[in-house]
Swiss-Prot record:
GO terms for biological process: D-amino acid catabolic process. InterPro entries: Daa-tRNA_deacyls_DTD, DTD-like_sf. An aminoacyl-tRNA editing enzyme that deacylates mischarged D-aminoacyl-tRNAs. Also deacylates mischarged glycyl-tRNA(Ala), protecting cells against glycine mischarging by AlaRS. Acts via tRNA-based rather than protein-based catalysis; rejects L-amino acids rather than detecting D-amino acids in the active site. By recycling D-aminoacyl-tRNA to D-amino acids and free tRNA molecules, this enzyme counteracts the toxicity associated with the formation of D-aminoacyl-tRNA entities in vivo and helps enforce protein L-homochirality. A Gly-cisPro motif from one monomer fits into the active site of the other monomer to allow specific chiral rejection of L-amino acids. It is found in: Cytoplasm. GO terms for molecular function: D-tyrosyl-tRNA(Tyr) deacylase activity; Gly-tRNA(Ala) deacylase activity; Ser(Gly)-tRNA(Ala) hydrolase activity; tRNA binding. This is D-aminoacyl-tRNA deacylase. Its EC number is 3.1.1.96. It catalyses: glycyl-tRNA(Ala) + H2O = tRNA(Ala) + glycine + H(+); a D-aminoacyl-tRNA + H2O = a tRNA + a D-alpha-amino acid + H(+). Its main location: cytoplasm. Signal peptide: none annotated.
Length: 147
């Protein structure tokens, strides 16, 4: 799994001008699933995301987790995280899981995450418009293959 984690003050996702998910202070996750991902990758990602201390405490230090601030998550499926740009000018996405597996794992990931924090989502496979106000900005790349 590859996940882009962005700390935000607010964010929303729309499909055809209809808002389907929105959060206030929290995290936007762009989630990519690889063919070799397992439920262990999901567990690792959920553990890291929910305990990562990337929110500021009263002294301005990044010392609080998403759980500590009672923040929310907006999770967006993003197969393009596996773009291969080595050849030519058109990216190839052969490094991404097939849509059936990716959808299944994306759902499981969001269900597991929802056991710890409030989760809003986009719609798997849809053409979405994501709006957000970055906080910091703080952007972190989590790759479950680099544990």
């Amino acid at each position: 799994m590859k996940i882009i984690i962005q700390r935000v003050n607010q964010a929303s996702v729309s499909i055809e001008d209809d808002v389907v998910g929105s959060i206030e202070k929290g995290l936007v996750l762009l989630v990519g699933i690889a063919p070799e991902d397992t439920t262990e990758d999901i567990a690792y990602a959920v553990r890291k995301i929910t305990s990562m201390r990337i929110f500021s405490d009263d002294e301005g230090r990044m010392n609080l987790s998403i759980q500590d601030i009672k923040g929310s998550v907006l999770s967006i499926s993003q197969f393009t995280l596996f773009a291969d740009t080595k050849k030519g000018n058109r990216p190839a996405f052969t490094g991404a899981a097939d849509p059936v597996k990716a959808n299944q794992f994306y759902d499981i990931f969001n269900q597991e995450l929802a056991n710890h924090v409030s989760v809003e989502t986009g719609q798997f496979g849809a053409d979405m418009q994501v709006s957000l106000i970055n906080d910091g900005p703080v952007t972190i790349v989590l790759d479950t293959k680099n544990k």
